[in-house]
Swiss-Prot record:
GO terms for molecular function: structural constituent of ribosome. The keyword Zinc does not apply. It comes from Oleidesulfovibrio alaskensis (strain ATCC BAA-1058 / DSM 17464 / G20) (Desulfovibrio alaskensis). Keywords: Ribonucleoprotein, Ribosomal protein. This is Large ribosomal subunit protein bL36. InterPro entries: Ribosomal_bL36, Ribosomal_bL36_sp. GO terms for cellular component: cytoplasm; ribonucleoprotein complex; ribosome. Belongs to the bacterial ribosomal protein bL36 family. The gene is rpmJ. Pfam families: Ribosomal_L36.
Length: 37
């Protein structure tokens, strides 16, 4: 899980979702998981 000021899709399978007011990127590649901090 990377914590970043700006989250972006890394690959076509990444999805940007909002969970409890926090932007997250979920992907089948665990290295692409991100959260806005």
């Amino acid at each position: 899980m990377k914590v970043r000021p700006s989250v972006k899709k890394v690959c076509p399978k990444c999805k940007v979702i909002r969970r409890k007011g926090v932007l997250r990127v979920i992907c089948e590649n665990p290295r692409h998981k991100q959260r806005q901090g």
